[in-house]
Amino acid sequence: MNNYWPNSQGPILNKEVAELLVRTSVKINKKLTNCSNEVLILDVFRTEVKRNLLKIILAELEKILLEIYTSNLDLSDVTNLTESILIDLFHRSIKRFCRLYELDYNSICQNVHDINYLMYDYKMLLQILIIQLIFGSSSKVKKTFNLFAENIPIKQVEIFLENYLIQLSNIIAHILIQNFETVQETNASYLCNVKFLSDRKLEKLKNNLVWNTLIQNYIERPRAIYESRYKVWVFYQDGLNCQYVYACRSTELYTLSSAQVLVTFLLEIQDFFIPKIKSTVFLIGQFIIYIGQNIFNQIMRTFLEIIRRSSNFKKQSSSL
């Protein structure tokens, strides 16, 4: 069995893509519990709702792949159209989801002023995924994710696809929750988990979304770029979990805002000072322990000497 993704277009690549999509569809029908300690907004939905959303995104992605394939777009075209493809996939998926659960798509989309801040990290991942599924392995993919590898493992392509499905469903969940004004709206379509079926909990969740977005945008993302890694979500036997993969992200450093650059600067300060502070504290601690042991030993010797002299004095007194 070949464990590596095909390098070029042809029947072998088409067969691998078909098998990959089937395997992913099977995984969606299994457990979707969040097994990690990370926040996943998708968890607000009932399991069946999560499953339907993931299936919708996978189906729409298949349609887009077929459209790209039949349009005879080349590698540079796909690279230039990545953002448009991403936004198109988002709107197709959310529109179909709204139709399924009788939600007002037009109202929701009117309130989506800018999804770029949510999707920025996924543009390159989608670009690489589509390139792999349509054109096979490319030098760009190898350079970005496999610095020393000659071939790309099938498992890696599988991880990219699973991650993209979960991440996009998470973004859609984020948009939908922000647009729910009252719990009746969520309860009417039986969307949400029973944990969130109260107005107070819904408002608390929406506030947490704002906070998590700030943390993700201004701390987690700059750190991940600076450390050359991506957080990816995958389907496991017990549910959903995340892991980190290497990615060369040096060019993305120039796209960071001033506040995000400040985070990388603080990381540099941390890398410079923390080891030195730790070693200094360790040395001071050893010195304190050494001094403390000497003082304790001196006190014990003095105490024992006093007892010895007191004992000798009593013996001399009794002999008299």
From Swiss-Prot:
Q: Which UniProt keywords apply?
A: Chloroplast, Plastid
Establish whether keyword Plastid is in the entry: yes
The principal localisation class reads: plastid
Entry GO CC:
chloroplast
Q: Where in the cell is it found?
A: Plastid, Chloroplast
Tell me its family: Belongs to the ycf55 family.
This chain belongs to which protein, by name? Answer: Uncharacterized protein ycf55
Per UniProt, what is the name of the gene that codes for the protein in this document? ycf55
